[in-house]
């Protein structure tokens, strides 16, 4: 694995290898909190869009591996404001670092970066396109909290049009046998047809607008992404259309996930329920990203 840009680029066996390595990283964290696999190495985090969990978990992961971090979170302090191209930025920064994690508002920016980099590039989110490291931590959460990925029944609820985490996860789940997916969203925020076409025939799909979660293993809530709407009035038409409450959950044997940040789509009272695993899901970002960084670096020096 030279880069991690899209879930389309990696197969089932590579996914399982990353999940196994993530388990080893979690064991190291629980046992001693750190290791020196990437001692003396540098990760560059290039965040052209705001981020809390992804950026901080990448930085934490690199430091837990014994490495160091450089990067930026505010492009107003970079040469981007002078008109420097993304390709030139990557060519320069790949000379300073051993790995690059990039988040960018433009679809395809991570792929372009990989084509201009001397070191492995990790897509930390490119517009509404892909977010592969989130997908891998989602799969790890499912494996740890549900116990299986094959024969999984999962409901995705909310913004399925702009939700890059949902696009990536659906594509990954299509590699596993017996998966059933419910896509629950308003008509304005349905899953893009290209994603549907990519996974149809590989898994059982159903689309609906009403919340039906009685027979699923996982409920995956998503935020309605205001920043993706060209017309803010369209956002307010769908804002708050789905809100998961204690009454929805009851005593169902279900795992509730959310890529975070949450706005109003999950009542805060749900946080105390045993079914709520979204904060644990966020924690899993550290061992999973440790595994990704370690494996990518090892492959780059073979």
UniProtKB/Swiss-Prot annotation:
Origin: domain of life: Archaea
- Report residues binding carbamoyl phosphate: 53-54, 103, 131, 134, 260-261
Q: What is this protein called?
A: Aspartate carbamoyltransferase catalytic subunit
GO BP annotations of the record are: 'de novo' pyrimidine nucleobase biosynthetic process; 'de novo' UMP biosynthetic process; amino acid metabolic process
Q: Where are the transmembrane segments?
A: none
What the entry lists under InterPro entries is as follows:
Asp/Orn_carbamoyltranf_P-bd, Asp/Orn_carbamoylTrfase, Asp/Orn_carbamoylTrfase_sf, Asp_carbamoyltransf, Asp_carbamoyltransf_Asp/Orn-bd
UniProt: L-aspartate binding residues: 82, 164, 223
Q: What is its EC number?
A: 2.1.3.2
Q: In which pathway does it act?
A: Pyrimidine metabolism; UMP biosynthesis via de novo pathway; (S)-dihydroorotate from bicarbonate: step 2/3
Fill in the subunit field for this protein: Heterooligomer of catalytic and regulatory chains.
| UniProt organism field | Methanococcus maripaludis (strain C6 / ATCC BAA-1332)
Output the PANTHER family linked to this UniProt entry.
ASPARTATE CARBAMOYLTRANSFERASE, ORNITHINE CARBAMOYLTRANSFERASE, MITOCHONDRIAL
Per its database record, what is this protein's job?
A: Catalyzes the condensation of carbamoyl phosphate and aspartate to form carbamoyl aspartate and inorganic phosphate, the committed step in the de novo pyrimidine nucleotide biosynthesis pathway.
Q: Which Gene3D superfamilies match?
A: Aspartate/ornithine carbamoyltransferase
Q: What terms describe the molecular function in GO for this protein? A: amino acid binding; aspartate carbamoyltransferase activity
Pfam families noted in UniProt:
OTCace, OTCace_N
The protein's matches in HAMAP family, at most eight in alphabetical order, are given as: Asp_carb_tr
- Catalytic activity as recorded in UniProt: carbamoyl phosphate + L-aspartate = N-carbamoyl-L-aspartate + phosphate + H(+)
Could you tell me the keywords of this UniProt record? Pyrimidine biosynthesis, Transferase
Q: Could you say which protein family the record assigns here?
A: Belongs to the aspartate/ornithine carbamoyltransferase superfamily. ATCase family.
